A protein has these predicted regions:
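Extended ligand-binding clefts on enzyme/binding-domain cores
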Residues: 149-153, 157-262, 269-280, 294-322, ...
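CBM-like carbohydrate-recognition segments
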Residues: 4-49, 63, 67-68, 79, ...
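Extended ligand-binding groove/face enriched in aromatic
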Residues: 70-72, 82-199, 204-208, 314
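Alpha-helical solenoid scaffolds that mediate protein-protein interactions
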Residues: 19, 60, 73-76, 80, ...
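A short, Lys/Arg-enriched amphipathic alpha-helix followed by its capping loop at the start of a domain
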Residues: 56-64
Length: 366
């Protein structure tokens, strides 16, 4: 369908309102290991969905200069930091990415010590697997000797962002290392897509699930890593090759609606919009910055259509799968419930904002 720039801007306004208005409804009971209640829905909680959401807001603010949005972001961090930060793990690191990107642009003195302390502790103390990968420990579970593709977005991008902004290459070096280790064990050489996880204890990829959102973390993650930090030329070339292989596979699996399924290669699994938004963002951005052909852009625009079709009048993105643990069979992924979330909102925001960066016959009209 033809989409105007005005339509995209209106949808973006609704998405921001929908995200900041999210509240847990008691549907999910997921207590943390320290006994505190886990809240992966409400905007005011410090967790990974909110961290991804804030990254989307910071990227949107950086593009628009919206002072009201900036105030919302800074107020969120001021309140959460004053209340006391949670224990460090992979998922509680996610909000640090948006804070780093905000600090990189504004250099607020109050945020720099928080960022530096967290980044230093990640490198020094975050549990590692064999070969030095970050073990995917989260607030409610220890995942011994496991690599998950989510970790690259939740942790490695923060290290790259803050390392570049602070002039400390050791953090960028660690981000590079994590992308390389995770690619070694999670990238499927046969399909070009990525498996959800790897266990060093069993030395296998669990269900060998080619999971949609997990793959979108990689698409977004590689492109944003290259965009935000000066990484080694050899690592850059290697990761771009990995990305090209992934996208070649994705282009063959896009549904007629423009969406992708939660199990990318399984036509019986449902179409899932957070993954679709991440792929749309990556495809449009990759084409715009000259890393891919026009085919990427056209597939990204079809994904943009699919995302817009799932933004409700209340600004809430529909058909987003809830937070997904490691599955030991493929049915596990098919059965994940659909639930509005901060990351669903954020990935949609990233996709729509990138759509505005791609002027064409679909988005130029006012």
């Amino acid at each position: 369908m033809a989409v105007s720039a005005a339509h995209i801007r209106t949808a973006l306004d609704r998405l921001v309102a929908g995200m900041t208005g999210l509240r847990a409804d008691g549907r999910f009971d997921e207590p943390n290991l320290d006994g505190t209640p886990g809240d992966y829905v409400s905007f005011d909680s410090w967790e990974w969905p909110q961290g991804v959401g804030l990254y989307g807001l910071v990227k949107l603010w950086a593009r628009t200069g919206d002072e009201g949005l900036l105030a919302t972001i800074e107020d969120w961090y001021d309140r959460r930091i004053a209340a006391g930060l949670p224990p460090m793990n992979v998922n509680t690191t996610a909000p640090m990415l948006a804070l780093s990107e905000l600090w990189r642009r504004r250099r607020q003195p109050r945020f720099e010590p928080v960022l530096h302390d967290w980044a230093s502790r990640v490198v020094a103390t975050m549990p590692r697997t064999p070969e030095g990968g970050f073990q995917h420990n989260v607030s409610d579970r220890i995942n011994d000797d496991e690599l998950w593709d989510d970790t690259l977005f939740m942790v490695a991008l923060f290290l790259a962002s803050f390392g570049q902004a602070s002039g400390e290459p050791r953090f960028v070096d660690e981000a590079e290392r994590q992308f390389l280790v995770h690619a070694r064990y999670l990238a499927d050489t046969r399909s070009g897509l990525w498996f959800h996880g790897w266990t060093f204890r069993g030395r296998h990829n669990f269900a060998r699930a080619l999971w949609g959102r997990g793959n979108s973390w990689i698409t977004v993650g590689i492109l944003d890593l290259i965009d935000m930090a000066q990484i080694s030329p050899s690592v850059r070339a290697y990761l771009l090759g990995v990305l090209e292989a992934q996208i070649a596979a994705l282009l063959k699996l896009q549904a007629p609606s423009g969406a992708w399924r939660t199990l990318l290669d399984d036509p019986t699994s449902y179409e899932e919009i957070s993954a679709t938004a991440g792929f749309g963002y990556g495809l449009m951005k990759g084409a715009r910055i000259g890393l891919g052909p026009a085919e990427w852009r056209q597939a990204g625009l079809r994904a943009l259509d699919a995302v817009l079709a799932n933004v409700g009048d209340d600004g809430v993105v529909a058909n987003v799968s809830y937070g997904t643990r490691m599955g030991h069979d493929l049915q596990f992924y098919r059965d994940i419930p659909l639930q509005p979330t901060g990351y669903g909102q954020a990935l949609a925001i990233l996709c729509l904002a990138e759509g505005l960066e791609n002027p064409n016959e679909m988005t130029e009209a006012a």
